[in-house]
Curated annotation (Swiss-Prot):
When the channel is activated, one or more imidazole moieties of His-35 probably become bi-protonated. InterPro entries: Flu_M2. It comes from Influenza A virus (strain A/Teal/China/2978.1/2002 H5N1 genotype W). The record marks W39 as: Seems to be involved in pH gating. This is Matrix protein 2.
Amino acid sequence: LLTEVETPTRNEWECRCSDSSDPLVVAASIIGILHLILWILDRLFFKCIYRRLKYGLKRGPSTAGVPESMREEYRQEQQSAVDVDDGHFVNI
């Protein structure tokens, strides 16, 4: 963090050391550090994070109380839908 701030005066540049005991400076420093850490983590793991947000939350309807045969039929329907979607991609 920057602890020295150069401010122009009428005659010359003087070096004014900011006092880090100021609560506003402390809060801004903490927020800045947290923002930097979160940004770095986001850039490093964005594929994993957004894939999980996109597909992890779509788990389908609850299967509580549904017979196993119907669950298996539902799984096969979902898989066949995925297989059909794969046919739309063209390899170049």
